[in-house]
């Protein structure tokens, strides 16, 4: 039987966990084997910009940080389960990637 690896990433960890819980509920309902959700390390993207645009005055900076949270779920990819997963409502802030493996 084929396996599906579902990779999820988002800047909002609460919405990401909500989608993971929906996929977990589908796996329990259909009775397929599932591993995960496995949390991967959070990537912190940092940008530092200078507040003063003209270059005069004291050097003061703004620091911006965006955290990207990731999860991986391995699940048996039978047709019924995959149809249910495709119907899950996914928020705009969550990116999903499904890869089928033998």
Swiss-Prot record:
Keyword presence, Nucleus: no
GO cellular component terms attached to this protein's record: small ribosomal subunit
SUPFAM superfamilies membership: Ribosomal protein S10
Matches recorded under Pfam families: Ribosomal_S10
A GO molecular-function annotation: structural constituent of ribosome
PROSITE patterns per UniProt: RIBOSOMAL_S10
Keyword annotations: Ribonucleoprotein, Ribosomal protein
Tree of life domain: Archaea
A Gene Ontology BP annotation from the UniProt entry: translation
Entry's family note: Belongs to the universal ribosomal protein uS10 family.
Subunit description: Part of the 30S ribosomal subunit.
Protein's job: Involved in the binding of tRNA to the ribosomes.
Listed name of the protein: Small ribosomal subunit protein uS10
Organism of provenance: Methanococcus maripaludis (strain C5 / ATCC BAA-1333)
Gene this chain is encoded by: rps10
